[in-house]
Amino acid sequence: MGEIYSPSQSKGFNQPYGYPMNCNLSRVFMEMTEEDRKCLEERKYWCFLLSSITTFCASMILVVIWRVVTHLCCQRREKEFVEPIPAPEAVQINMNGSKHAPSETDPFLKQQEEKHLGWMTEAKDWAGELISGQSLTGRFLVLLVFILSIGSLIIYFYDASFQNFQVETCIPWQDSPSQQIDLGFNIFFLVYFFIRFIAASDKVWFLLEMYSWIDFFTIPPSFVAIYLQRNWLGFRFLRALRLMTVPDILQYLNILKTSSSIRLTQLVTIFVAVCLTGAGLVHLLENSGDFFKGFINPHRITYADSVYFVLVTMSTVGYGDIYCTTLCGRLFMIFFILFGLAMFASYVPEIADLIGNRQKYGGEYKGEHGKKHIVVCGHITYDSVSHFLQDFLHEDRDDVDVEVVFLHRVVPDLELEGLFKRHFTKVEFFTGTVMDSLDLSRVKIGDADACLVLANKYSTNPDAEDAANIMRVISIKNYSSDIRVIVQLMQYHNKAYLLNIPSWDWKRGDDVICLAELKLGFIAQSCLAPGFSTMMANLFAMRSFKTSQTTPDWLNLYLCGAGMEMYTDTLSHSFVGMTFPEAVDLLFNRLGLLLLAIELKDEENKECNIAINPGPHIVIQPQTQGFFIAQSADEVKRAFFWCKQCHDDIKDVSLIKKCKCKNLALFRRNTKHSTAARARATDVLQQFQPQAPAGPMGHLGQQVQLRMINQQSSTSDTHLNTKSLRFAYEIKKLMPSSGGRRNSMSIPPDGRGVDFSKDFEQQFQDMKYDSTGMFHWCPSRNLEDCVLERHQAAMTVLNGHVVVCLFADQDSPLIGLRNFIMPLRSSNFHYHELKHVVIVGDLEYLRKEWKTLYNLPKISILNGSPLSRADLRAVNINLCDMCVIISARVPNTEDTTLADKEAILASLNIKAMQFDDTLGFFPMRHQTGDRSPLGSPISMQKKGAKFGTNVPMITELVNDSNVQFLDQDDDDDPDTELYLTQPFACGTAFAISVLDSLMSTTYFNDSALTLIRTLVTGGATPELELILAEGAGLRGGYSTPETLSNRDRCRIAQISLQDNPYDGVVHNTTYGAMFTIALRRYGQLCIGLYRLHDQDNPDSMKRYVITNPPAELRIKNTDYVYVLEQFDPGLEYEPGKRHF
């Protein structure tokens, strides 16, 4: 150890250094000057310290005295001006009825109160407004105080870090620029202190605040330094505590907006402020020495080393290279460690956690210039995200240059995080919620191309899930009304709430995917054409097809169709002037594309309508948008590039690319002669009419004209026969009323010229349609009138009907059975073609659903159990056209494999049943005429299934993996994807998960969802959506030409080739030849086959779906053909027969 200086030594400090030389020196300092030694002989630190303590004590005493005097004066004033209780006769009643006692002291009291409250209140309000962060002046003042505090702290750092610094210096004030600047800062701090003092409601607590102590220990010493002509380093380091106001200042400036950023800033500033303050006190105590020893043991240490020492000590590392040697310093460190260790252990991990999370999923989205992005929110899990990304980023999509931004409040788990990392070039994730506008701004929702809201399909409370998604849409639309929103909803009746959002606009691209509506619609269409649900599900899902020689033939054919998708593109100029069948034939046979529909532009209403297989009366116009079925988007480009001049002789369709010839004149010529093409289309239509029952509304007008002639020829007879009455009734429906269009059921249209009896009106009561003409309608019926007992059902001749096995109880949420029944009641079917629907389930649950079903005809209910074989036999399940197994119960969330236990048990129960070898007959048509290709609705006798395995059935599943339990004889791997399993390929199973692909399909092509909804729902229109949104259900209306014209629309059908429906089509005919014959002669558009799985087993009824087979495929006489056919107005209802 070096020598220690003591007062007994020479006065001139004989030591070469003013302090001892030892191993704990932090650095080498310059030799003290003679002036520094003389200055330190007589220390004046106590003057600076005493000024701070005196200022505080004086301020506190003055505040206490003021409070005591004010309290005494108030008590005395209250005693002097106590109002005497007035006598009863002195009490007066004023005009408003209240009582008061007149007193001469009233004005004086009021004046005293105003004086007392006047200047004090005004001064307090003025000071409070001046320092408030709500005003611009207050924000500026707070920011200025912080800047000057940091400036004062920087001056302290300079003074404490100077090489030959001393705790006390005798430099005169006028010779020290740092003291002069610091004094100016302290004058401003003094003014700010008085403003805060005036604004404080409690003066005592104000004096005890931390920032007040900072002012007490920094402002008075700067004035004392002028008087003493010396400076003391003192407690100026306390200005570092002003750093804790940084979060408030940044919030005033709207820089900090999220709770995590605010908390992170608070933790960092508190930690830094405490470290700097503690280091300042260690620096002061060590460099001063112990005061009770006469400051003979100072420890020279710089401020930077003090900060290092404090951090190392707080972290409990303690290297020992620097330590405290003075007793005061050690005592301080004992207490500082207790506080600092607790703060270090709690603050540092939280800071690290906030910084780590912020770096991962915080911040803002920074997209590339010119690159689109979408925001996906709602139910974000591994399953929902993986299904979405698998379809959205599929390789078959044409140049998907869109980034996907996921926004969710929960940090992704490891599985989901790994999925994001695999798609890191296309996907980003941010923590937050769309309910917060700050989070919406972080993901740049205003610049996004669309926002997609996903729903939890397995939610135990569907209505609550829909309400949450609707609130998300409201928040998004409130932030940016122009953003396109695509939202998933569980229940159909919740769609109405979206219409209440002012900025919700279907024309702008906003759309809702109702899972219950589409799920039940798919199942309903499978009742009309078994397997159609599988075909449509494969069409809007992106799947790749790869052939393999080891794969069975049936699976290759199925996978070839499963790889097909629905695309849209513009037809080239070479198609302009062609009729729709001509364009379809050319595209299929020459280009290998299947054209399903086109977009028709309504110039008057400036709207576009989708026409599905519209028939030969529609002519292709320039820039017509087509809806295609193809393997990829590149294949669809052939329709856009095809040129008759350049590509007419090309056999290899892969060579059809953009040609270099200039066809502008040809394009104009095609446009010019579009009128001539329409005339040619009329000739083609007349050529098609004798053979094809389907036709446009012009055909229907011809039928009406013939009926009017028949009616005129029969009016001379006194008694009308039944056929004449039927013709007259059709005339009554078609003729417009004198008062215009009427849809009200309360006022019958007049002016018909024919008198009908009440019995006749009652007889045709069940033939009415709803007000839009899109669905069959009947007057509301009581539930009890449609309930069948078991013995009643057994005695009823049920054949060709639909049996719905519904698992539900009284507390089950509504699934919207109307969405299942309405497609089966579409008006493009005649009344006698409607399949009777028998629901087997709980009556109390159906009572809740009945208010949406009582206007739909041909519905019966059997109050029983779908697992009861007696109930199933009573409804003739062996003679039904389709058995549907669905469940309304809340799925099991603990074990997903048990979610479908009832549906699986019901399916296996039916398959294990055996039936008598009975025959069921459909009503035979007595009129002669050509046989319709539809076959079954006109003339067919159906043999009942002898075994339950032959009963046509479709089962709804919640969990995809449970499909392995439906077929016990298949060889599907339990890990096989749903679309690769036999039950799904055969159309006997349907899961709601297949609808996940609709989100990306709708985003890339907003018209695709309209096309799918039109095919699936039977023709739901926006007008009908508004009617149902009112909550009153379907409304009936009298038939008018406008409403009846809505019947003329396309429908799905399944035709058996065993009935030889097409002339010239026999066994082993190519599919392409059958396609052309069906299209040209019958106006039917073939879209697929339903083929037997085992051709060698005559007892096997299992079939699989082939979507859009290749033209060279050979058909078999056992195949069923999926066709899109037009409405046939020639099939009329015969009142003399009963139909189910």
From Swiss-Prot:
Region (Segment S9): 797-817
TM region(s), chain numbering: 45-65, 140-161, 179-199, 204-224, 229-249, 265-285, 332-352
This protein's UniProt keywords: Calcium, Cell membrane, Ion channel, Ion transport, Magnesium, Membrane, Metal-binding, Phosphoprotein, Potassium, Potassium channel, Potassium transport, Synapse, Transmembrane, Transmembrane helix, Transport, Voltage-gated channel
Region feature Segment S8, mapped onto this chain: 578-598
Disruption phenotype: RNAi-mediated knockdown in young worms (1 day old) fails to increase motor activity in mid-late life, but in older worms (5 - 7 days old) reduces the rate of motor activity decline, resulting in higher motor activity in mid-late life and increased life span.
Cytoplasmic side: 66-139, 200-203, 250-264, 353-1140
Pfam families (alphabetical): BK_channel_a (PF03493), Ion_trans (PF00520), Slo-like_RCK (PF22614), Slowpoke_C (PF21014)
A GO molecular function held by the record: large conductance calcium-activated potassium channel activity
Region of interest (Segment S10), residue spans: 984-1004
Tissues expressing this chain: Expressed in synaptic regions of the nervous system including in both the nerve ring and nerve cords, as well as in the body-wall and vulval muscle. Expressed broadly in motor neurons. Forms puncta at presynaptic terminals of neurons, muscle excitation sites, and in the dorsal nerve cord.
Residues covered by region (Segment S7): 520-540
Binding positions (Ca(2+)): Q964, D967, D970, D972
Membrane topology: Multi-pass membrane protein
Intramembrane segments: 300-322
Consequence when changing E350Q: In cim113; reduces the frequency of lateral swimming, known as thrashing, by comparison with wild-type. This defect is suppressed in erg-28 background mutant, but restored in erg-28 and sel-11 double background mutant
Miscellaneous comment in the UniProt entry for this protein: Its activity is activated by ethanol, leading to the inhibition of neuronal activity.
Domain free text: The S4 segment, which is characterized by a series of positively charged amino acids at every third position, is part of the voltage-sensor.
Protein known as: Calcium-activated potassium channel slo-1
UniProt gene name: slo-1
